[in-house]
Regions:
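Surface-exposed, charge/polar-rich loops and edge strands
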Residues: 3-17, 21-199
Length: 199
């Protein structure tokens, strides 16, 4: 379940809280380093093959956090192929905090020099880009803030707010009524429960 708490703080501050922040929602401001994008191969969107675009975001304190901006097809993989997705200056994004991905048993190793990234591991990207002040304990999945879908296609977060107490109450109320019905039917059939007609 996603925690619908919106933070106006840096990921570094959240990480420093010492809490379990996986899937925590936050807001970030900074500058995208579009020239240092990497592309996660083998990603799909509605059955279409493509990539996930991971862009470093430089924050006001010069620290860097990696942002998984979402899906693009091969035709729009490189920044030059989608100038409409490039930003100028400081921007603000919404996202959710994610732990570094674990490499699957049959997933190949990342090959940075060849541009083949299969698993999102912030520490490997940081070494490849020679970043010094970078967050490697987490990365952020950017989420959509509009119904209009644009490239890269960011994650869609749906939160179903349920009244668990009401559900439980209705469930047990139904069970109780059923048991009462069974009780009455049993005793009537056994002749233990009858109704006398008024004279």
């Amino acid at each position: 379940e996603f925690r619908r708490v919106l933070f106006r703080s840096s990921v570094n501050e959240i990480v420093g809280s010492g809490k379990d922040n996986q899937f925590r929602r936050l807001s970030l401001t900074g500058t995208f380093l579009d020239d240092d994008e990497i592309y996660l191969v083998g990603r799909t969107y509605e059955g279409n093959a493509g990539f996930h675009v991971v862009t470093p975001l430089r924050q006001a304190d010069d620290s860097i956090i990696f942002i998984n901006r979402g899906w693009v097809s091969e035709d729009y993989r490189l920044p030059a192929q989608r100038p409409f997705s490039l930003t100028q200056g400081v921007i603000q994004i919404d996202g959710i905090v994610r732990l570094p991905q674990q490499q699957g048993y049959f997933v190949p190793d990342n090959e940075p020099e060849r541009g083949f990234w299969f698993t999102l591991k912030p520490d490997e990207i940081a070494r490849f880009r020679d970043y010094s002040s970078v967050e490697t304990a987490y990365y952020v999945d950017q989420v959509r803030t509009s119904e209009v879908i644009t490239l890269p296609i960011a994650a869609e977060v749906r939160v179903d707010v349920r009244n668990a107490h009401l559900n439980y109450a209705l469930t047990w109320f139904g069970v109780a009524l059923s048991l009462i019905g069974v009780y009455i039917a049993y005793h009537v059939s056994a002749g233990r429960l009858g109704f006398r007609a008024k004279k």
